A protein has these predicted regions:
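Non-ligating segments of multi-cofactor redox enzymes
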Residues: 1-344
Length: 344
């Protein structure tokens, strides 16, 4: 993290506050009639994934951890509570946990045992960020630290993230995970603001920018993960879907991520209908309509609406707050002074 002086940051906020507050007061979420086009998308083929059962850690999970090790959080030893509650989220002593998403594990393999007409079947499902076409996390972030690039990769700039976790609250799959004891809030107001920083898969955005394949794809021995040009990926996913549907001869949905939350850059294809997978996941974790998922364990519900797009009041309530506008303006100036850390 860039060294940020508390006094300097508040000075920057003071400079930015007038313009930022007036700007935020006029801004409203954009409702674009045309859907943006991104260059890249990916397929996760559940029919190919075997979970690397013979290994202690699946290869995609290990490759992701190796690649992102420099980006993992290193919290202070004496972590302050989330004022006014005496709690905080700390995964630093559970870094080896690969059974769910954490700030130290950005992808994991979900293992399900299914009862099908052909008998019991075991399936393995790589889970990570879906990289939505219209990311709710980006829209709701009050400080503008979440971005989506031309390749469709959604990234969090943990340098300026306050860890308020609003991104996780509005993410349909609860993907971003919070680590306390790190982040800019420790420099600014450790007892009054934020709660750390948020972390998640960024689709190896730095590699995609150089036309290189992400770590999970290059490490998979079964070819279960494929990145490529968006139109080609969508065409290929439809072809695989039709093939699986014909072989299964069962009614159901064999593709996931194409329509959920308004569409994503991650397409799952499966030889078993997602209705069955979703039901098995619900039973395994006792998911209910009121509690459809657990922290770090995303669901597979077929009906996923982009509720931020349909609830502009939710965005306005966050983005129009004067303090938020001032801090967001300060962050924008600080980021411009800092430059793009990924370009170095």
């Amino acid at each position: 993290m860039q060294q940020i002086n508390r006094r300097h940051f508040f000075k920057v906020i003071g400079i930015a506050s007038v313009g930022a507050m007036s700007l935020n007061a006029k801004e409203t979420p954009q409702n674009n009639s045309t859907k943006p086009t991104y260059k890249t998308a990916s397929i996760i083929d559940i029919g190919r994934c075997d979970g690397c059962k013979d290994l202690g850690t699946p290869k995609c999970v290990q490759a992701c951890q190796n690649k992102n090790l420099p980006n993992f959080p290193n919290p202070i030893s004496n972590i302050p509570y989330y004022f006014p509650r005496k709690i905080y989220e700390d995964y630093s002593k559970d870094r080896d946990n690969i059974s769910r998403l954490t700030p130290y594990n950005w992808t994991y393999i979900e293992n399900l045992i299914l009862d099908t007409p052909q008998g019991q079947q075991e399936v393995f499902i790589p889970r990570r960020c879906m990289h939505c076409d219209d990311p709710t996390c980006q829209k709701i972030c009050p400080f503008g630290v979440i971005s989506k690039d031309e390749n469709g990769a959604v990234s969090i700039d943990d340098t300026f993230c306050f860890g308020g976790a609003k991104c996780r609250d509005v993410c349909p799959w609860g993907i971003p995970q919070r680590q306390a004891g790190v982040g800019i809030y420790l420099k600014i107001a450790p007892k009054l603001a934020g709660g750390g920083a948020m972390y998640k898969c960024d689709s190896c955005a730095d590699l995609l920018a150089k036309n290189q394949a992400p770590a999970c794809e290059t490490s998979c021995p079964k070819g279960a993960i494929t990145f490529g040009k968006r139109d080609e990926i969508f065409k290929k996913a439809q072809e695989i879907t039709e093939s699986y549907k014909q072989k299964a001869q069962m009614q159901g949905t064999y593709i996931y991520g194409d329509t959920q939350n308004g569409g994503t850059s991650t397409l799952y294809v499966s030889p078993i209908p997602f209705e069955i997978l979703d039901n098995a996941l619900n039973q395994k974790y006792s998911f209910t309509k009121e509690k459809p998922q657990k922290v770090g364990i995303p669901h597979l519900n077929l009906e996923v609406k982009n509720f931020v797009s349909s609830d502009s009041a939710l965005i306005k309530s966050v983005l129009l707050a004067p303090v938020v506008g001032a801090i967001a303006g300060g962050i924008a100036i600080a980021k411009s002074n800092k430059g793009d850390k990924n370009a170095k």
